[in-house]
């Protein structure tokens, strides 16, 4: 994921956080408040007891962007019926777009490929640029 983002010209910072919605919430808020425009989280979107990434995103109180997760689940069904179990989520918090992707490397790759064509436009809209 990092290499693919860098190939698109993004500055990438990668971190591994411990489980827990509160830790993730604080970290996401700090990054978004510092001016980061896009945060991609991987993992914690399943049905397991430690899967709390969507809850951390919702706790931010930003604007939900449900279409991104809906698109990924819909397109992901062509790869596996299990995509419908994903609790992927996306929110706009201030001027930052935060997307919670599944944790498996294959699902991350597939979902990033699905989102790549629309991410630049989404970020431009958040920045207040024209809706070209």
Predicted feature locations:
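Non-catalytic beta/alpha edge segments that cap or flank active sites
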Residues: 1-132
């Amino acid at each position: 994921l990092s290499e693919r983002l860098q190939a698109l010209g993004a500055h990438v910072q990668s971190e591994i956080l411990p489980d827990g919605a509160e830790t993730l919430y604080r970290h996401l808020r700090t990054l978004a408040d510092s001016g980061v425009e896009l945060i991609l989280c991987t993992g914690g979107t399943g049905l397991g007891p430690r899967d709390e990434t969507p809850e951390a995103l919702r706790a931010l109180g930003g604007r939900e962007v449900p279409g991104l997760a809906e698109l990924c689940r819909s397109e992901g069904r062509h790869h596996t019926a299990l995509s419908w179990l994903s609790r992927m989520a996306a929110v706009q918090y201030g001027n930052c777009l935060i997307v919670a992707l599944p944790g498996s490397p294959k699902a991350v790759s597939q979902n990033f490929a699905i989102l790549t064509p629309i991410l630049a436009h989404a970020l431009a809209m958040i920045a207040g640029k024209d809706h070209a």
